[in-house]
């Protein structure tokens, strides 16, 4: 075999995935479509270079251009979020969160984060995750009537449990989050406040959601999702002294060599996010999300959790359709709509089955969908879930999906 000869099986799978993305309406809220420039940066020769350490303080030689790349990513990130400190090396959002915990906590310390069925993330204290195994994790839920954050209850839990760290942010919450209320609770009990804004980072960057950066001690995020960059993580803060602890907690504390080709792709994405067109994009993401939510609210069998959305996603309760979240996910897959099953607040079904779906609009907006198109997608979902065994309905749904993806090809 010649060096560099392609594996036919591998490239067949890659081409098949490319076709799947082109032919599918992508509604997974954490997915998006990156630019060719982001992909080019990630596939560059930077993948060949080891660069343990930070710009100007490397353990290897030959890092002069790597330093320029990483410093650009840092500078763009700081400008994008008006932050004093940025670390762009975390391999993922989970690694970013782990790094912050390692910097601020000791094993056994108490953390207070959003529960999974309320919309929280595994790394916010789930018992099956490192965050719930290494630390004493306490979860807060939503107000059962409004299905929104219950700050009185969060404050009560904080006073009772005395956490060293309070975690704000979510992976499945559709409303504006009041960071200042979290700050007041954290100050009252003497806790650090960490915000995980992985899902809404793009909205924060454009001002479509209030920024946690001036309020929290530290902010973590992914660099994909609404930032439309490569898969990876980042840590921000306005506290430079805390930043020094985070730097050492990440390297050598949590990771070794950074993925500089991914950091280059992060820099390119942040550069794109700083352009005026990105603000227009995020505005359209929210318009599409609200349009879909309104269409679902007009359905007799689908309920939108909390009654609507303020951001890029919504959770829909499909209990009345008689279809589980798992079956709905598979059913929609069959008509080329990709979404994911999601627990609803107080869900009696397991997280592997669920009574809901999470719907997000970042990827369809990147393709060019506008409000009428978003409404059409919602109508297709409603009809499929209302008549899940009607072959005619499913065939028509697939045709309507095909019309939309042909109208808005991935560029």
UniProtKB/Swiss-Prot annotation:
<comment type="pathway">
    <text>One-carbon metabolism; tetrahydrofolate interconversion.</text>
</comment>
<dbReference type="InterPro" id="IPR015424">
    <property type="entry name" value="PyrdxlP-dep_Trfase"/>
</dbReference>
<dbReference type="GO" id="GO:0005829">
    <property type="term" value="C:cytosol"/>
</dbReference>
<dbReference type="InterPro" id="IPR039429">
    <property type="entry name" value="SHMT-like_dom"/>
</dbReference>
<keyword id="KW-0663">Pyridoxal phosphate</keyword>
<keyword id="KW-0808">Transferase</keyword>
<comment type="function">
    <text>Catalyzes the reversible interconversion of serine and glycine with tetrahydrofolate (THF) serving as the one-carbon carrier. This reaction serves as the major source of one-carbon groups required for the biosynthesis of purines, thymidylate, methionine, and other important biomolecules. Also exhibits THF-independent aldolase activity toward beta-hydroxyamino acids, producing glycine and aldehydes, via a retro-aldol mechanism.</text>
</comment>
<dbReference type="InterPro" id="IPR015422">
    <property type="entry name" value="PyrdxlP-dep_Trfase_small"/>
</dbReference>
<dbReference type="GO" id="GO:0030170">
    <property type="term" value="F:pyridoxal phosphate binding"/>
</dbReference>
<comment type="subunit">
    <text>Homodimer.</text>
</comment>
<feature type="binding site">
    <location>
        <begin position="350"/>
        <end position="352"/>
    </location>
    <ligand>
        <name>(6S)-5,6,7,8-tetrahydrofolate</name>
    </ligand>
</feature>
<dbReference type="GO" id="GO:0035999">
    <property type="term" value="P:tetrahydrofolate interconversion"/>
</dbReference>
<dbReference type="InterPro" id="IPR019798">
    <property type="entry name" value="Ser_HO-MeTrfase_PLP_BS"/>
</dbReference>
<keyword id="KW-0554">One-carbon metabolism</keyword>
<comment type="similarity">
    <text>Belongs to the SHMT family.</text>
</comment>
<dbReference type="InterPro" id="IPR001085">
    <property type="entry name" value="Ser_HO-MeTrfase"/>
</dbReference>
<dbReference type="InterPro" id="IPR049943">
    <property type="entry name" value="Ser_HO-MeTrfase-like"/>
</dbReference>
<feature type="modified residue" description="N6-(pyridoxal phosphate)lysine">
    <location>
        <position position="225"/>
    </location>
</feature>
<feature type="site" description="Plays an important role in substrate specificity">
    <location>
        <position position="224"/>
    </location>
</feature>
<protein>
    <recommendedName>
        <fullName>Serine hydroxymethyltransferase</fullName>
        <ecNumber>2.1.2.1</ecNumber>
    </recommendedName>
</protein>
<comment type="pathway">
    <text>Amino-acid biosynthesis; glycine biosynthesis; glycine from L-serine: step 1/1.</text>
</comment>
<feature type="binding site">
    <location>
        <begin position="120"/>
        <end position="122"/>
    </location>
    <ligand>
        <name>(6S)-5,6,7,8-tetrahydrofolate</name>
    </ligand>
</feature>
<dbReference type="Pfam" id="PF00464">
    <property type="entry name" value="SHMT"/>
</dbReference>
<dbReference type="GO" id="GO:0019264">
    <property type="term" value="P:glycine biosynthetic process from serine"/>
</dbReference>
<keyword id="KW-0963">Cytoplasm</keyword>
<keyword id="KW-0028">Amino-acid biosynthesis</keyword>
<dbReference type="InterPro" id="IPR015421">
    <property type="entry name" value="PyrdxlP-dep_Trfase_major"/>
</dbReference>
<dbReference type="GO" id="GO:0004372">
    <property type="term" value="F:glycine hydroxymethyltransferase activity"/>
</dbReference>
């Amino acid at each position: 075999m010649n060096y560099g000869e392609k594996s036919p099986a591998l490239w067949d799978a890659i081409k098949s995935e490319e076709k799947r993305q082109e032919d599918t309406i992508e509604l997974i809220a954490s997915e998006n479509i990156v630019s060719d420039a982001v992909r080019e940066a990630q596939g560059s020769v930077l993948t060949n270079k080891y660069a343990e350490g930070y710009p100007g303080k490397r353990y290897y030689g030959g890092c002069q251009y790597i330093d320029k790349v990483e410093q650009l990513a840092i500078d763009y990130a700081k400008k994008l979020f008006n932050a004093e400190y940025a670390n762009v090396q975390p391999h993922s959002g989970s690694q970013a969160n782990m790094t912050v915990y390692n910097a601020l906590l000791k094993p056994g310390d108490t953390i207070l984060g959003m529960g999974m069925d309320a919309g929280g993330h595994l790394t916010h204290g789930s018992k099956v995750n490192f965050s719930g195994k290494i630390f004493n994790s306490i979860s807060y839920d939503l107000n059962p009537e409004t299905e929104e954050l219950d700050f009185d209850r969060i404050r009560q839990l904080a006073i009772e449990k005395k956490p060293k760290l309070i975690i704000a942010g979510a992976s499945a919450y559709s409303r504006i989050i009041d960071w200042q209320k979290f700050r007041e609770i954290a100050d009252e009990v003497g806790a650090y406040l960490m915000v995980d804004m992985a899902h809404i980072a793009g909205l924060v960057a454009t001002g479509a959601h209030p920024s946690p950066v001036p309020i929290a001690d530290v902010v973590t995020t992914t660099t994909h999702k609404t930032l439309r960059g490569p898969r990876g993580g980042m840590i921000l803060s306005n506290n430079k002294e805390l930043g020094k602890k985070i730097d050492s907690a990440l390297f050598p504390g949590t990771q070794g060599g950074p993925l500089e080709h991914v950091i280059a792709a992060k820099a390119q994405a942040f550069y794109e996010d700083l352009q005026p067109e990105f603000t227009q994009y995020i505005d359209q993401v929210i318009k599409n999300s609200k349009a879909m939510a309104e269409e679902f609210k007009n359905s007799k069998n689908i309920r939108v959790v909390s009654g609507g959305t303020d951001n890029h996603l919504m959770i829909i309760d499909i209990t009345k359709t008689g279809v589980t979240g798992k079956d709905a996910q598979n059913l929609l897959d069959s008509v080329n709509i990709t979404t994911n099953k999601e627990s609803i607040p107080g869900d009696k079904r397991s997280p592997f089955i669920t009574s809901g779906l999470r719907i997000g609009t970042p990827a369809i907006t990147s393709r060019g969908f506008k409000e009428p198109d978003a409404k059409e997608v919602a109508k297709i979902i409603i009809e499929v879930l209302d008549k899940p065994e009607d072959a005619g309905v499913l065939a028509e749904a697939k045709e309507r999906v095909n019309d939309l993806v042909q109208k808005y090809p991935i560029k």
